[in-house]
Amino acid sequence: KMFNDDWMRERGFLDEEITKAEDVIKDHIDKPLIVARTEELVSHAIERMRQYKISQIPVMDSIGFVGSLDESDLFQSYVSDKNTAERPIREIMGKPYPIIQLGTTIEEVSKLFSRENAAVLIDLGNGSHHIITKYDIIGSIK
């Protein structure tokens, strides 16, 4: 062989194989995780979701991740209460997203998504986290 696969991959001639959670986020791992806080109003979360063009957001309190909000939660809440935007996030948030480790396989990550679970958080090992969405998984398919 004239060129080995590692040399070709390093120079962009071969596609990287996406097999682990960190492979999915490597192109945007430097971006901060956008979160909402339980005591904030729902309107603040909506504003943040619009600003960053995201459809789901993890919710934190002083202890850590305690919930989540997505478009579906917001829509259902708005249908039943037109004043949803003025309520605290803790009153309408859903369950927290599962937290995975960097080495988790794509197959394992994919199994965590469901109608009720729109995202997964990945523990970066340095006290910070990142988010993986269904869109990220679909976008990683070559």
Listing of model-derived features with the role each one plays in the protein:
Residues 1-142:
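Tandem CBS (Cystathionine beta-synthase) repeat/Bateman regulatory domains
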